[in-house]
Protein backbone atom coordinates (compact mmCIF):
# COMPACT_ATOMS: atom_id res chain seq x y z
CA UNK A 1 0.00 0.00 0.00
CA UNK A 2 2.95 2.24 0.60
CA UNK A 3 3.59 2.21 -3.12
CA UNK A 4 0.36 4.00 -4.04
CA UNK A 5 0.79 6.63 -6.64
CA UNK A 6 -0.75 10.06 -6.32
CA UNK A 7 -3.36 9.08 -8.91
CA UNK A 8 -4.48 6.01 -6.96
CA UNK A 9 -4.62 7.99 -3.73
CA UNK A 10 -6.79 10.65 -5.32
CA UNK A 11 -9.06 7.94 -6.77
CA UNK A 12 -9.46 6.31 -3.33
CA UNK A 13 -10.35 9.67 -1.82
CA UNK A 14 -13.07 10.21 -4.40
CA UNK A 15 -14.54 6.79 -3.63
CA UNK A 16 -14.42 7.45 0.10
CA UNK A 17 -16.10 10.83 -0.25
CA UNK A 18 -18.86 9.22 -2.23
CA UNK A 19 -19.35 6.63 0.50
CA UNK A 20 -19.68 9.02 3.41
CA UNK A 21 -21.34 12.30 4.13
CA UNK A 22 -20.56 12.46 7.33
CA UNK A 23 -12.72 10.08 17.38
CA UNK A 24 6.87 13.05 25.71
CA UNK A 25 6.82 15.03 28.64
CA UNK A 26 4.50 15.31 31.58
CA UNK A 27 0.79 15.66 30.98
CA UNK A 28 -0.28 19.32 30.95
CA UNK A 29 -2.94 20.64 33.29
CA UNK A 30 -6.44 19.65 32.09
CA UNK A 31 -8.35 22.28 30.18
CA UNK A 32 -12.02 22.38 29.32
CA UNK A 33 -12.52 21.88 25.58
CA UNK A 34 -13.95 24.82 23.73
CA UNK A 35 -16.92 24.55 21.44
CA UNK A 36 -16.04 23.93 17.79
CA UNK A 37 -14.96 27.19 16.26
CA UNK A 38 -16.27 28.81 13.13
CA UNK A 39 -14.03 28.75 10.06
CA UNK A 40 -11.19 31.22 10.20
CA UNK A 41 -10.44 33.76 7.52
CA UNK A 42 -8.54 32.16 4.64
CA UNK A 43 -5.53 34.44 5.11
CA UNK A 44 -4.87 32.91 8.52
CA UNK A 45 -4.13 29.52 6.98
CA UNK A 46 -0.66 30.51 5.75
CA UNK A 47 2.07 29.79 8.33
CA UNK A 48 4.44 32.60 9.07
CA UNK A 49 8.15 32.14 8.55
CA UNK A 50 10.01 31.90 11.86
CA UNK A 51 12.05 34.87 13.00
CA UNK A 52 15.09 35.10 10.76
CA UNK A 53 13.04 34.22 7.67
CA UNK A 54 14.33 30.66 7.23
CA UNK A 55 12.27 27.52 7.71
CA UNK A 56 13.24 25.10 10.46
CA UNK A 57 11.98 22.28 8.25
CA UNK A 58 13.61 20.15 5.57
CA UNK A 59 15.18 21.04 2.26
CA UNK A 60 13.49 19.90 -0.94
CA UNK A 61 16.10 17.17 -1.34
CA UNK A 62 15.64 15.94 2.24
CA UNK A 63 11.86 15.97 1.89
CA UNK A 64 11.95 13.91 -1.30
CA UNK A 65 13.69 11.07 0.57
CA UNK A 66 10.95 10.73 3.21
CA UNK A 67 7.86 8.50 3.10
CA UNK A 68 4.86 9.34 5.28
CA UNK A 69 2.08 6.86 6.02
CA UNK A 70 -1.11 8.48 7.34
CA UNK A 71 -3.33 6.29 9.54
CA UNK A 72 -6.96 7.05 8.69
CA UNK A 73 -10.01 4.85 9.34
CA UNK A 74 -12.56 2.62 7.60
CA UNK A 75 -13.34 3.63 4.02
CA UNK A 76 -16.99 4.16 5.01
CA UNK A 77 -16.18 6.78 7.65
CA UNK A 78 -14.94 10.35 7.94
CA UNK A 79 -11.37 9.58 8.99
CA UNK A 80 -10.56 8.07 5.58
CA UNK A 81 -11.23 11.01 3.25
CA UNK A 82 -9.78 13.55 5.67
CA UNK A 83 -6.71 11.43 6.35
CA UNK A 84 -6.34 10.90 2.62
CA UNK A 85 -6.41 14.65 2.13
CA UNK A 86 -3.56 15.05 4.63
CA UNK A 87 -1.57 12.53 2.60
CA UNK A 88 -2.32 14.45 -0.59
CA UNK A 89 -1.38 17.81 0.98
CA UNK A 90 1.96 16.40 2.10
CA UNK A 91 2.51 14.83 -1.30
CA UNK A 92 1.88 18.21 -2.90
CA UNK A 93 4.61 19.57 -0.63
CA UNK A 94 7.16 17.06 -1.89
CA UNK A 95 6.81 13.96 0.30
CA UNK A 96 6.02 10.44 -0.84
CA UNK A 97 2.87 9.45 1.06
CA UNK A 98 0.25 6.78 1.57
CA UNK A 99 -3.15 6.94 3.29
CA UNK A 100 -3.78 3.65 5.08
CA UNK A 101 -7.33 2.47 5.81
CA UNK A 102 -7.53 1.20 9.41
CA UNK A 103 -10.08 0.45 12.11
CA UNK A 104 -9.59 4.06 13.29
CA UNK A 105 -8.53 5.21 16.76
CA UNK A 106 -7.49 1.99 18.48
CA UNK A 107 -5.51 0.66 15.54
CA UNK A 108 -4.06 4.08 14.77
CA UNK A 109 -2.68 4.40 18.29
CA UNK A 110 -1.08 0.97 17.98
CA UNK A 111 0.27 1.71 14.50
CA UNK A 112 1.96 4.87 15.77
CA UNK A 113 3.50 2.95 18.67
CA UNK A 114 4.64 0.15 16.34
CA UNK A 115 6.14 2.59 13.85
CA UNK A 116 3.73 1.54 11.10
CA UNK A 117 2.49 5.11 10.60
CA UNK A 118 4.20 8.47 10.87
CA UNK A 119 0.98 10.37 11.63
CA UNK A 120 -2.54 9.13 12.41
CA UNK A 121 -5.96 10.40 13.44
CA UNK A 122 -7.32 9.43 16.86
CA UNK A 123 -9.85 10.54 19.45
CA UNK A 124 -8.25 12.34 22.35
CA UNK A 125 -10.05 10.40 25.10
CA UNK A 126 -8.61 7.09 23.91
CA UNK A 127 -5.22 8.69 23.33
CA UNK A 128 -5.06 10.01 26.88
CA UNK A 129 -6.09 6.64 28.30
CA UNK A 130 -3.27 5.01 26.32
CA UNK A 131 -0.82 7.72 27.38
CA UNK A 132 -1.67 7.33 31.06
CA UNK A 133 -2.38 3.56 31.00
CA UNK A 134 -5.87 4.06 32.38
CA UNK A 135 -9.36 2.97 31.37
CA UNK A 136 -9.23 0.62 28.38
CA UNK A 137 -5.41 0.66 28.62
CA UNK A 138 -5.17 -0.12 32.32
CA UNK A 139 -2.47 -2.67 33.05
CA UNK A 140 -0.48 -1.77 29.94
CA UNK A 141 2.67 0.31 29.81
CA UNK A 142 1.98 4.05 29.40
CA UNK A 143 2.17 4.98 25.73
CA UNK A 144 4.74 7.70 26.34
CA UNK A 145 5.90 7.64 22.71
CA UNK A 146 2.67 9.30 21.56
CA UNK A 147 2.93 12.99 20.68
CA UNK A 148 0.46 15.47 19.24
CA UNK A 149 0.86 17.30 15.94
CA UNK A 150 -2.37 19.34 15.93
CA UNK A 151 -6.04 19.39 16.86
CA UNK A 152 -8.56 18.31 14.26
CA UNK A 153 -12.39 18.25 14.40
CA UNK A 154 -14.87 17.29 17.13
CA UNK A 155 -16.39 13.83 17.23
CA UNK A 156 -19.94 13.86 18.54
CA UNK A 157 -21.06 10.87 20.58
CA UNK A 158 -24.45 9.90 19.21
CA UNK A 159 -26.81 7.31 20.69
CA UNK A 160 -29.44 6.21 18.19
CA UNK A 161 -32.40 3.87 18.38
CA UNK A 162 -35.81 3.42 16.79
CA UNK A 163 -39.11 4.56 18.25
CA UNK A 164 -40.45 1.04 18.75
CA UNK A 165 -37.80 0.25 21.39
CA UNK A 166 -39.18 2.80 23.85
CA UNK A 167 -35.67 4.04 24.61
CA UNK A 168 -35.72 7.79 25.27
CA UNK A 169 -32.85 8.23 27.76
CA UNK A 170 -29.53 6.58 28.55
CA UNK A 171 -30.96 4.88 31.63
CA UNK A 172 -33.42 2.98 29.40
CA UNK A 173 -30.53 0.94 27.99
CA UNK A 174 -30.59 -1.44 30.95
CA UNK A 175 -31.54 -4.90 29.75
CA UNK A 176 -31.25 -3.88 26.09
CA UNK A 177 -28.94 -5.11 23.34
CA UNK A 178 -26.60 -2.21 22.61
CA UNK A 179 -24.03 -1.77 19.84
CA UNK A 180 -21.03 -0.39 21.74
CA UNK A 181 -18.46 -0.41 18.94
CA UNK A 182 -15.70 -2.84 18.09
CA UNK A 183 -13.80 -3.99 21.19
CA UNK A 184 -11.31 -1.36 22.40
CA UNK A 185 -12.20 0.99 19.55
CA UNK A 186 -12.68 4.69 20.14
CA UNK A 187 -16.46 4.23 19.98
CA UNK A 188 -16.35 1.43 22.53
CA UNK A 189 -14.27 3.55 24.89
CA UNK A 190 -16.85 6.34 24.55
CA UNK A 191 -19.73 3.94 25.19
CA UNK A 192 -18.13 2.42 28.28
CA UNK A 193 -17.32 5.81 29.81
CA UNK A 194 -20.74 7.29 29.11
CA UNK A 195 -22.58 4.28 30.50
CA UNK A 196 -20.42 4.40 33.63
CA UNK A 197 -21.31 8.06 34.14
CA UNK A 198 -24.94 6.97 34.38
CA UNK A 199 -24.15 4.08 36.73
CA UNK A 200 -24.50 1.43 34.01
CA UNK A 201 -22.00 -1.37 33.36
CA UNK A 202 -21.85 -3.96 30.61
CA UNK A 203 -23.42 -6.39 33.09
CA UNK A 204 -26.58 -4.26 32.89
CA UNK A 205 -26.87 -4.46 29.09
CA UNK A 206 -26.25 -6.96 26.30
CA UNK A 207 -23.22 -5.43 24.56
CA UNK A 208 -22.63 -6.06 20.88
CA UNK A 209 -18.98 -5.45 20.00
CA UNK A 210 -19.58 -4.35 16.43
CA UNK A 211 -18.58 -1.35 14.35
CA UNK A 212 -21.51 1.03 14.33
CA UNK A 213 -22.35 0.36 10.68
CA UNK A 214 -22.79 -3.35 11.40
CA UNK A 215 -24.71 -2.64 14.61
CA UNK A 216 -27.11 -0.32 12.78
CA UNK A 217 -27.71 -3.05 10.19
CA UNK A 218 -28.57 -5.39 13.07
CA UNK A 219 -30.93 -2.77 14.49
CA UNK A 220 -32.75 -2.63 11.16
CA UNK A 221 -33.22 -6.40 11.43
CA UNK A 222 -34.49 -6.21 15.00
CA UNK A 223 -31.31 -7.74 16.44
CA UNK A 224 -30.09 -4.63 18.27
CA UNK A 225 -31.95 -1.99 20.28
CA UNK A 226 -29.57 0.99 20.31
CA UNK A 227 -26.20 1.92 18.87
CA UNK A 228 -23.39 4.26 19.91
CA UNK A 229 -21.92 6.24 17.02
CA UNK A 230 -18.98 8.62 17.34
CA UNK A 231 -18.21 10.84 14.37
CA UNK A 232 -18.41 14.28 12.89
CA UNK A 233 -21.81 15.61 11.92
CA UNK A 234 -23.71 14.48 10.00
CA UNK A 235 -22.94 10.77 9.81
CA UNK A 236 -24.07 9.18 6.54
CA UNK A 237 -25.01 5.84 8.12
CA UNK A 238 -27.17 7.56 10.72
CA UNK A 239 -28.75 9.75 8.05
CA UNK A 240 -29.71 6.64 6.08
CA UNK A 241 -31.25 5.07 9.19
CA UNK A 242 -33.32 8.21 9.77
CA UNK A 243 -34.66 8.11 6.22
CA UNK A 244 -35.67 4.46 6.36
CA UNK A 245 -36.89 4.15 9.97
CA UNK A 246 -38.51 6.18 12.73
CA UNK A 247 -35.16 6.95 14.33
CA UNK A 248 -34.65 8.53 17.75
CA UNK A 249 -31.47 10.36 18.74
CA UNK A 250 -31.22 9.74 22.48
CA UNK A 251 -29.96 12.70 24.54
CA UNK A 252 -26.83 12.39 26.66
CA UNK A 253 -27.70 14.93 29.31
CA UNK A 254 -28.47 15.59 32.95
CA UNK A 255 -26.42 14.43 35.93
CA UNK A 256 -24.70 11.70 33.94
CA UNK A 257 -23.32 14.18 31.45
CA UNK A 258 -22.27 16.54 34.24
CA UNK A 259 -20.36 13.70 35.89
CA UNK A 260 -18.69 12.71 32.61
CA UNK A 261 -17.34 16.15 31.71
CA UNK A 262 -16.30 16.78 35.31
CA UNK A 263 -14.23 13.59 35.51
CA UNK A 264 -12.82 13.67 31.98
CA UNK A 265 -11.79 17.13 30.76
CA UNK A 266 -11.43 15.99 27.14
CA UNK A 267 -15.23 15.69 26.93
CA UNK A 268 -17.35 18.81 26.46
CA UNK A 269 -21.08 19.45 26.44
CA UNK A 270 -22.61 19.93 23.02
CA UNK A 271 -25.82 19.67 21.06
CA UNK A 272 -26.70 17.84 17.88
CA UNK A 273 -28.48 20.68 16.08
CA UNK A 274 -32.10 20.34 15.03
CA UNK A 275 -32.55 18.84 11.57
CA UNK A 276 -29.10 17.25 11.52
CA UNK A 277 -31.06 14.05 11.06
CA UNK A 278 -34.80 13.65 11.54
CA UNK A 279 -34.56 15.42 14.93
CA UNK A 280 -36.80 18.49 14.93
CA UNK A 281 -35.12 19.93 18.05
CA UNK A 282 -31.56 20.20 19.36
CA UNK A 283 -30.42 17.04 21.16
CA UNK A 284 -28.10 17.39 24.16
CA UNK A 285 -24.86 15.44 23.97
CA UNK A 286 -21.08 15.48 24.27
CA UNK A 287 -18.13 15.67 21.93
CA UNK A 288 -14.44 14.84 22.09
CA UNK A 289 -11.80 16.21 19.76
CA UNK A 290 -9.80 14.19 17.29
CA UNK A 291 -6.11 14.97 17.20
CA UNK A 292 -3.34 14.11 14.76
CA UNK A 293 -0.80 11.85 16.42
CA UNK A 294 2.84 11.78 15.42
CA UNK A 295 5.66 9.39 16.22
CA UNK A 296 7.93 10.68 18.96
CA UNK A 297 11.06 9.48 17.15
CA UNK A 298 10.50 11.66 14.07
CA UNK A 299 13.01 14.49 13.86
CA UNK A 300 11.99 17.96 14.98
CA UNK A 301 12.81 19.29 11.51
CA UNK A 302 10.55 16.76 9.77
CA UNK A 303 7.61 17.41 12.10
CA UNK A 304 8.02 21.17 11.68
CA UNK A 305 8.21 20.68 7.92
CA UNK A 306 5.08 18.51 7.83
CA UNK A 307 3.10 21.24 9.53
CA UNK A 308 4.40 23.78 7.04
CA UNK A 309 3.28 21.47 4.24
CA UNK A 310 -0.13 20.86 5.77
CA UNK A 311 -0.92 24.55 6.06
CA UNK A 312 0.64 25.44 2.72
CA UNK A 313 -1.96 23.10 1.20
CA UNK A 314 -4.77 23.49 3.73
CA UNK A 315 -7.34 24.01 0.96
CA UNK A 316 -6.83 20.37 -0.07
CA UNK A 317 -7.70 19.22 3.45
CA UNK A 318 -10.66 21.57 3.87
CA UNK A 319 -12.16 20.34 0.59
CA UNK A 320 -12.22 16.73 1.82
CA UNK A 321 -15.19 17.01 4.19
CA UNK A 322 -17.44 19.56 5.86
CA UNK A 323 -15.99 18.68 9.28
CA UNK A 324 -12.50 19.49 8.03
CA UNK A 325 -13.59 22.70 6.35
CA UNK A 326 -15.15 24.04 9.56
CA UNK A 327 -12.65 22.85 12.11
CA UNK A 328 -9.14 22.34 10.72
CA UNK A 329 -7.33 25.67 10.66
CA UNK A 330 -4.05 27.13 11.87
CA UNK A 331 -5.84 29.66 14.10
CA UNK A 332 -7.13 26.99 16.48
CA UNK A 333 -4.98 23.99 15.54
CA UNK A 334 -3.33 23.79 18.94
CA UNK A 335 -6.37 24.51 21.15
CA UNK A 336 -7.60 21.93 23.69
CA UNK A 337 -4.76 19.46 23.14
CA UNK A 338 -3.89 17.60 26.33
CA UNK A 339 -1.31 15.21 24.92
CA UNK A 340 2.20 16.73 24.87
CA UNK A 341 3.15 18.25 21.53
CA UNK A 342 6.10 16.86 19.61
CA UNK A 343 9.03 19.31 20.03
CA UNK A 344 8.94 20.05 16.31
CA UNK A 345 5.24 20.86 16.56
CA UNK A 346 5.90 22.95 19.65
CA UNK A 347 8.40 25.01 17.66
CA UNK A 348 6.02 25.43 14.71
CA UNK A 349 3.11 26.62 16.82
CA UNK A 350 5.37 28.94 18.83
CA UNK A 351 6.91 30.47 15.70
CA UNK A 352 3.42 31.14 14.35
CA UNK A 353 2.33 32.83 17.56
CA UNK A 354 -0.20 30.31 18.86
CA UNK A 355 1.69 29.19 21.95
CA UNK A 356 4.13 31.12 24.10
Model-derived features: positions:
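N-terminal (or domain-start) structured segment
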Residues: 47-123, 129
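Ligand-binding clefts/hinges and TM-proximal coupling segments of bilobed small-molecule sensing domains
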Residues: 176-193, 264-337
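An extracytoplasmic/periplasmic, membrane-proximal ligand-sensing/linker region
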Residues: 64-68, 82, 210, 214, ...
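Bilobed "Venus flytrap"/periplasmic-binding protein-like clamshell domains
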Residues: 65-93, 97, 155-221, 331, ...
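Pocket-lining segment of extracytoplasmic ligand-binding domains
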Residues: 124-126, 134-137, 165, 201-293, ...
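Short, low-complexity disordered leader/linker segments with a strong preference
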Residues: 1-67
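Acidic, polar ligand-binding/catalytic clefts
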Residues: 117-153, 235
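Extracytoplasmic
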Residues: 65, 94, 104-107, 114, ...
Amino acid sequence: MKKLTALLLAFCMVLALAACGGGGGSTPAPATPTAPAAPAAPAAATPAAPSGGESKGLTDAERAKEFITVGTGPTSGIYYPIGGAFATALQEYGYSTSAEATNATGQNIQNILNGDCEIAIAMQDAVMQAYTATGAYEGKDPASDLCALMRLWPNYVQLVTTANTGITKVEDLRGKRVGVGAANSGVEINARMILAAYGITYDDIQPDYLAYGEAIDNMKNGQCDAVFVTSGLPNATVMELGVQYDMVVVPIDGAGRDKLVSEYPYYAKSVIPANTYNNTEDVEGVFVYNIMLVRKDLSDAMVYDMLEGIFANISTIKASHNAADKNIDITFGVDDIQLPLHPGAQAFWADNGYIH
